[in-house]
Amino acid sequence: MFIPQNKSKRLSLDKIGQLEEDLELNPLDYNKWQKLIDQLIIKDNQEQVRNTFDKYLKIFKFDGASWCKYIKYELNRDEKEKVENLFQQCLGITDNVELCRLYVDYVRGVTDFVTGGEKARGVVVQAFEFAINKVGIDITSESLWQDYIQFLQSWNPNANWEQQQKIDLIRKVYKKFLTIPTENIEVSWSQYTKWENELNPATASKFISEKSGEFMLARSWNTEFNRITDKSLKRNLNPGDHNDEDVVKQLKYWLRWLELEKENKLELKDETVNDKRIQYVYKQATYALPFVPEIWFQYVKYLLVQNEEGNLQESIRLLKEGGLVLNPKSMLLTFQLAELYERDNSFNNAKIVFKNLLDALQKDYNSVANQIAELKERIDPATDKDNIQEDDDDNEEEEEEENDNDNDNDNGGDSKQQPPSKKLKLNPNGGQNGSNSENNGEAVSAPSSSVKLPQVYRISLADSKQLLSFENEQKRLSDAITLTYVKFMIASKRSEGIKEARNVFKQARKFTDIGYQIFIESALLEHYSDKKSTALKIFDLGKKNFATNGKFLLNYLDYLIMINDVDTMRTVIQSSDANFTKEIGNLQEELKLTNLDPITRKKLEKQITNLKKFLKQLYKKYISFAATFLSLDVTHSFAKKCEQLFPKDDPIDLFTDRYKLDNINIIKKDELGRDDILTSFDGIIDEEELQRLKRRKLSNGSGSSSSYSFNEEESKSAIKNIEEQKTRVQQEQDQENQGINKPEESFVGPSIIALMSALPNASYFGLPSESVFNSEKLVTLFANLSNIPSQ
């Protein structure tokens, strides 16, 4: 949902003008281009139609269907010179069966067979051969081949040698045609065999047998193609992107077709012919799915694998004039083209590519920022001063409270600190309790003569969801801009040295929402250019902007550990402690405000959780370093401070964390019977480890006791707990059933029900093939339970 813009709109009757305005804002809107072209053709303003077609085809230059529409428009007005110019433009840049058929039809129409004779026929044959060489391998090219055969069959020779020439030409066309797996190849084969038999039954079997092998391969290929594409592959242009379900489905079909071609199921001996087929399919895929960067990337990658030096310029042209014209905000294609320019020693062109992407992303970022500002302005109306009497002390106290309640972003300290955000205040007439009583201790004190309600947030759930959506999009764009600047800076260092990289870094810092990663990468570039003092200055500069960003500070700490700067490490830990503690306190105060919608509350809680998580991680990293390279006194000092900050945490977790082998806490695993992931002190779960956790095995193992094996004491304890739970279950059943036993309960009994309700479900133990469950101990456990029904 977008906020309406305050701009004048054209009258609804002016459809053409409105479409033109919309296309000025978004020139990649394929559907609106088609609507505009159709409207103009109806209006029949020739110059306007031509201008619109020209503008459209500069962007969608490969759209064969639109070229056909443009040419037919000119043919209807008998503009032959214009038509020929259009054919010259389009036939070199797009491969389209219907466009080639239109070209051949035009050549036949302007050729005088009466006076031209054999020469005129030769011109048409050349046109057919041109079209066949261009699109004859297309699975939909049957109509073009049939046109060619029918044209040759319509020739009425005057001499015997001309008759034989006609037969040879037709047989030659059939020979090429029947090796192509077209849609109705079986019908075409029947047509060919009938022609041979009618021509000369004595020689028919000879010619037919010569082609039957290739025909069988083509027919098998056609069957396989229909199977892998479910007969659902669409060849027309799809204006959707990778988020569109239909596009995802079509992409799957195109990739399957490409794999089929690469497998060479037609058993083509000439590799150049097979390569031509593969490239043709790649082209058709980019025509059908122009807004899917993956297709463009893979096409270029294929060309470079086949012949890197020979296809370098073609790859650059393909991305510059095709992929990035249609996907100007694609990081994938931008970085691919930038690398190609760099390999071609054309870094100035690479700079342009990077800057174009930054401009496009910045434009979108500014648009989202404006939408956020308008939304906040709408949901934060000015306080009615007539109903609230405030003296100077009140104003000062409010300012202090606002400064104490700075609102960070959704990542819990993972982004740059922002100025104190403006509170969304409750209108005096809209308070929850309708009184000026104190609410959760948050009411601002006021003189006894003043009537004042607590200062709280006021935002509807719908507005909160919309704001969250905008903020997520803003974060996505901020990350994309940061990534682009980082890679631009690194590429500049490779090509032009550290000074040019510094210029990019300086430019990146002008973006107010630049990510912390740019500081880390810039510092590392300086470090590996033997500028360690400069690297430290950059890290220090980043620390000022990202004082509560856990990810930045962890990277900073890693760097300080690498260069063994103990004093700065200690300073970073101490300042981070103070900054994080203050920020957590501010957020906790905000949580006390009334009328917080669930989304905002969850957002604040997430920020607090993340801040605590990263503060723990910082302490853990430094304590581990101190225990390894400094002294136990330093280690104990910081460990004590950490335990004071997080008194509810198990001290064993912190202690054993510095006694890991690689990243495995063997002590907890072998001696305490705990999963290292579940009790990890830093609270950060690696995705691979998380999957391992879901599939963990319950086995004794060889030579060691299992963390989850039951000994005799554990069994007794488990039985006792189950007996207690059984009593509760039995009571609930008695109340529910009122003395009437259900069949399933009389079979298993309340003890088993209690046990099963206490155990986790089967998926908790992983796949059946991976789990090891001791059935004997389970039977022993069941046997010791009371209230087991007898058979």
Curated annotation (Swiss-Prot):
Subcellular locations according to the entry: Nucleus; Cytoplasm
Presence of the UniProt keyword Disulfide bond in the record: no
Disulfide bonds: none
GO biological process: mRNA 3'-end processing; RNA 3'-end processing
Gene Ontology CC terms: cytoplasm; nucleus
Principal location listed in the UniProt entry: nucleus
This protein's record includes keyword Nucleus: yes
Database matches in SMART domains: HAT
Region (Disordered): 379-449, 725-745
Positions with biased composition (Basic and acidic residues): 379-388
Residue spans of biased composition, Low complexity class: 427-442
Gene Ontology MF: a single term: mRNA binding
Keywords: Cytoplasm, mRNA processing, Nucleus, Repeat
Acidic residues biased stretches: 389-411
UniProt name for this protein: mRNA 3'-end-processing protein RNA14
